[in-house]
């Protein structure tokens, strides 16, 4: 493989081979990006948006959790820095993060997601946004964040990446097509090993879908999505599909074939008609239970993302669970913003835990707030507050992420930020029991201890 340092020729929608290898730049601490989009959301956006997943993966062979985020440079420039960090579960130490890409944008929509293959190579998928291109990177060594190969430079907004047991890579992404009224369309493509991609062979899954969440369980892909009609803010309805051939064909939850591309709002994959209920939904997470059945976490709202403040109430965190025959819908708690995002996990004992900024913070009715850990012991029917992780904070916390295949020492991580004006953004993580730690903003050593937060 030829290795050199230099510019990369853009390869839009072409089959790509390894093109460049470089030594990524060692960072000097954990600092999140601050970002705003007028009228909808603002604040600490290091782990935004929810439609890029996964952002963190626990690797049992290395006993480390690797996680990506959008960072800010030490000199305070607002250029988004694509960063990767690691947590050593044996030593309880954080690695000094690595700068993989200094992006020519401050748009947090370009934040990355990641995956780890069966050989331990770390793949990073840097999202595209408008004229800003996406990229795919692979670590030069297994379970190592010091150097990466650049594989692809292409257009892939909202990437979601999963690696099957046979080594094939599935990538879901979005395209914008203003020519036929379907502004946002969902596509997927597959690579044999993640190093070569042919985006011309992508499968078009849905028109007007856009916002989706995916997960892979024992060879079966699940996808949940809403209807985001022609770019309007009225995202509604809840749909679920599954695939046993890594996205070539799809079926409904009960196994009936789905014609592609799906056209909304009428499709057999609809599991709840929120359009008739005049409600809006904001997808947060999709996981599977011990039987492989899907569970969805989402916000149910009375108004779209521009309907912030009390006029958007009531807003509820909701779960939708499939038991193999039918769907069950249950509320967890109320929230005060459509983008009060979080994640859901189920442990080996069947305990459900949802974590996110569900309490109002110092800036109510804006993105995020105070982080709370919620628990259910009856498959999501009833919930209790297990622990309030943050309180009396200076800034709102937002966009809590939980690693795929998590280990209890590193359960959730996120950033904070002032939602009313540009500010610094610190990064935090917690363990399964809700013990809270802050990641140091300044680091001069390869590995450091996290800072306990009382």
Where are these regions (language model features)?
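Bacterial N-terminal signal peptides that target proteins for export
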Residues: 1-10
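Bacterial N-terminal signal peptides
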Residues: 9-20
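Extracellular, repeat-based ectodomains that mediate carbohydrate processing or recognition
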Residues: 25-454
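A cross-taxon signal for low-complexity, glycine/charged-rich
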Residues: 7, 23-24
């Amino acid at each position: 493989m030829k290795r050199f340092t230099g510019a990369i020729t853009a390869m839009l929608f072409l089959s790509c081979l390894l093109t460049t290898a470089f030594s990524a730049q060692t960072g000097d601490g954990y600092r999140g990006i601050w970002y705003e989009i007028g009228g909808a959301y603002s604040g600490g956006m290091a782990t935004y948006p929810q439609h890029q997943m996964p952002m963190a993966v626990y690797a049992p062979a290395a006993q480390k959790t690797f996680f990506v985020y959008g960072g800010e440079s030490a000199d305070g420039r607002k250029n988004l820095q694509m960063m990767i960090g690691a947590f050593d579960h044996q030593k309880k130490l954080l690695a000094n993060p690595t700068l993989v890409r200094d992006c020519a944008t401050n748009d947090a929509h370009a934040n990355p997601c990641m995956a780890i293959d069966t050989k331990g190579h770390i793949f990073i998928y840097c999202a595209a946004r408008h004229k800003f291109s996406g990229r795919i990177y692979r670590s030069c060594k297994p379970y190592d964040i010091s150097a990466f190969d650049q594989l692809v430079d292409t257009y892939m907004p909202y990437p979601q990446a999963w690696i099957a047991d046979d080594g094939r890579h599935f990538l879901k992404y979005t395209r914008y097509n203003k020519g036929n009224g379907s502004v946002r369309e969902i596509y997927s493509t597959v690579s044999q090993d993640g190093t070569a991609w042919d985006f011309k062979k992508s499968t078009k899954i849905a028109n007007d879908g856009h916002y989706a969440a995916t997960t892979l369980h024992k060879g079966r892909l699940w996808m949940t999505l809403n209807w985001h009609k022609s770019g309007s803010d009225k995202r509604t309805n809840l749909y679920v599909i599954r695939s046993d051939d890594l996205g070539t064909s799809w079926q409904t939850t009960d196994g009936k074939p789905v014609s592609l591309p799906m056209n909304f709002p009428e499709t057999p994959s609809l599991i709840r008609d929120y359009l008739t209920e005049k409600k809006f939904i904001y997808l947060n997470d999709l996981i599977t239970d011990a039987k492989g059945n899907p569970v969805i976490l989402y916000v149910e709202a009375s108004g779209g993302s521009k309907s912030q403040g009390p006029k958007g109430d009531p807003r509820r965190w909701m779960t939708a669970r499939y038991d193999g025959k039918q769907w069950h819908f249950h509320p967890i708690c109320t929230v005060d913003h459509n983008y009060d995002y979080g994640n859901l996990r189920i442990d080996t004992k069947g305990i459900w835990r949802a974590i996110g900024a569900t309490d109002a913070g110092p800036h109510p009715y804006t993105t995020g707030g105070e982080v709370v850990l919620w628990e259910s012991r009856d498959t999501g029917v009833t919930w209790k507050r297990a622990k309030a992780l943050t309180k009396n904070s200076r800034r709102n916390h937002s966009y809590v992420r939980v690693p795929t295949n998590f280990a209890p020492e590193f359960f959730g991580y996120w950033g904070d930020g002032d939602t009313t004006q540009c500010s610094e953004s610190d990064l935090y993580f917690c363990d399964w029991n809700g013990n809270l730690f802050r990641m140091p903003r300044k680091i001069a050593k390869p590995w450091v201890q996290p800072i306990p937060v009382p």
